[in-house]
């Protein structure tokens, strides 16, 4: 989603400091600015599937860096010789499933929540039906399953999302239900 603004010169020339999140929504002279952003609460549609592209090809460096940064020293992620001897691993190390989960959610950010999310409220029903290996490309899709206005936080709403990640063959490699707190469209 993009944010467009129209107006006349002076719209952005106030002597007051303008938050960086608002600068791109203004007009300078006759020029229109457009900012990439996620969806406001009102723009989420229950039942709509959002396809997130482009995909993300996972490298060995991604897996090793993520695994060591998060202190997960499982041999199945780090030890190539050990993994080569394990049945069902194709002779390869598995990509850390937390990297897969993080990437699945990350692929959705630009389209759904960039600059509009207040908080992740929780994840549930997380599963990894198939493993991810170095060289696999992940694609994500999200279905908005529910939304409601926040009772305790005016100007915000709760949006429930069902994320799915697939590899380059279309195999489902991850699923998760996610609940988020999202800003409503600002009142002007």
Predicted regions and their residues:
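Hot-dog-fold acyl-thioester-processing enzymes
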Residues: 2-4, 12-121, 187-188
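Generic structural detector for well-ordered beta-strands
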Residues: 51-57, 127, 179-181
